[in-house]
Amino acid sequence: MNAPPTFESFLLYEGEKKIIKELDMKVPNAAIFTVNKEDHTLGNMIRNQLLKDPNVLFAGYKLPHPLEHKFVLRIQTTSEYSPHEAFMNAITDLLSELSLFEERFREAMKEKKEGGD
């Protein structure tokens, strides 16, 4: 089988960076972020969060190859807002939303156990 070992899908190699940022010179105020050891789950969540931001003109991601465990995220923003700021704000907002979701989920589970349903 040609599939790489399973651990390669989540362990960073020595010296490998989790996120690599490069400026996109083809369009103004754009950047390309390569996120290693992640897949559609995180890529789609970040893209959707970015699209909620009115200063983000474009946000899209792709997986270069099914056997490569990374996604490439392209972000273009308005001139007064950098792609890096948009990326960081999207991640911060996602963390807040997921924390709230976790809290509500735990409360619902607690109510379910106490209710005896």
From Swiss-Prot:
Keyword Nucleus: yes
Kinase found in the keyword field: no
Location(s) in or outside the cell: Nucleus
A GO term, aspect molecular function: protein dimerization activity
Keyword terms, alphabetized: DNA-directed RNA polymerase, Nucleus, Transcription
GO biological process: transcription by RNA polymerase II
A matching Pfam family: RNA_pol_L_2
A single Gene Ontology CC term: RNA polymerase II, core complex
InterPro entries in the record: RBP11, RBP11-like, RBP11-like_dimer, RNA_pol_Rpb11_13-16kDa_CS, Rpo11-like
Chief location of this protein within or outside the cell: nucleus
SUPFAM superfamilies given in the database record: RBP11-like subunits of RNA polymerase (SSF55257)
Role summary: DNA-dependent RNA polymerase catalyzes the transcription of DNA into RNA using the four ribonucleoside triphosphates as substrates. Component of RNA polymerase II which synthesizes mRNA precursors and many functional non-coding RNAs. Pol II is the central component of the basal RNA polymerase II transcription machinery. It is composed of mobile elements that move relative to each other. RPB11 is part of the core element with the central large cleft.
Subunit structure: Component of the RNA polymerase II (Pol II) complex consisting of 12 subunits.
Family listed: Belongs to the archaeal Rpo11/eukaryotic RPB11/RPC19 RNA polymerase subunit family.
Name the UniProt record assigns to this protein: DNA-directed RNA polymerase II subunit RPB11
Organism annotation: Anopheles gambiae
